């Protein structure tokens, strides 16, 4: 008599396991698109784009001005012209060094602003079926740019509770991390943690 009861217990346990597995699969494979993250900062990135553009123009104008040769004073033809070869060489080196420095600073400001805007995530959308995810970044001037990748090519490098401000996402085939500001809105935290927020070895 104990054998049939044990058999029914095993069958019931397997049925419950199958039901829980199907429910978990359904949770991570929604029938329609689901918004997982959203953080609107269009005004901030518009101001950041204008600031970086202004800095680029400013440092470029300084570099051009430093390359301009200063006017040489007019001397009488009968006066003896002293030899200023060493002084001219130092002046030329200083002007070219200043131009290179100004160009480097301007390029650094522009590059940092461009990279930050292209890697700051505005929204994360899990596509129907749970196989693909669409990331939308703020892009320069807050214009926005989006791309869709398979979910198995996205890896979250830290849990939401482990980082104070920014959540880093690694996308296979793309350099640098994508940043999710924790000040944003997570409409479905459980689904986010099980899909985009999960760590994967890429």
From Swiss-Prot:
Keywords: Membrane, Mitochondrion, Mitochondrion inner membrane, Transmembrane, Transmembrane helix. Its main location: mitochondrion. The keyword Cytoplasm does not apply. Residues 1-43, 119-202 are mitochondrial matrix. It is found in: Mitochondrion inner membrane. GO terms for biological process: mitochondrial cytochrome c oxidase assembly. Residues 65-97 are mitochondrial intermembrane. The keyword DNA repair does not apply. Disulfide bonds: none annotated. InterPro entries: Tmem223, TMEM70/TMEM186/TMEM223. GO terms for molecular function: mitochondrial ribosome binding. The chain crosses the membrane at residues 44-64, 98-118. It is a multi-pass membrane protein. GO terms for cellular component: mitochondrial inner membrane; mitochondrion. Associates with the mitochondrial ribosome. Belongs to the TMEM223 family. Mitochondrial ribosome-associated protein involved in the first steps of cytochrome c oxidase complex (complex IV) biogenesis. Stimulates the translation of MT-CO1 mRNA and is a constituent of early MT-CO1 assembly intermediates. This is Transmembrane protein 223.
């Amino acid at each position: 008599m104990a054998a049939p009861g044990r058999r029914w217990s095993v069958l019931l346990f397997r049925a419950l396991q199958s039901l829980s597995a199907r429910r978990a699969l359904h949770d991570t494979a929604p029938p329609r698109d689901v918004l997982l993250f959203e953080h609107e900062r269009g005004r901030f990135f518009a101001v950041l784009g204008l600031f970086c553009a202004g800095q680029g123009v400013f440092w470029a104008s300084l570099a051009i001005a430093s390359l301009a040769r200063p006017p040489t004073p007019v001397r009488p033809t009968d006066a003896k012209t002293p030899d200023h070869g060493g002084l001219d060489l130092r002046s030329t080196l200083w002007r070219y060094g200043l131009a290179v420095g100004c160009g480097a600073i301007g390029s650094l400001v522009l590059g940092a602003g461009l990279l930050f805007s292209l890697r700051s995530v505005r929204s994360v959308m899990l596509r129907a079926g749970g196989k693909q995810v669409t990331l939308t970044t703020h892009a320069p001037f807050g214009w926005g740019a989006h791309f869709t990748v398979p979910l198995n090519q996205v890896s979250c490098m830290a849990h939401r509770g482990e980082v104070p401000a920014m959540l880093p996402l690694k996308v296979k085939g793309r350099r640098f991390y994508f940043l999710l500001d924790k000040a944003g809105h997570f409409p479905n935290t459980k689904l986010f943690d099980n899909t985009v927020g999960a760590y994967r070895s890429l």
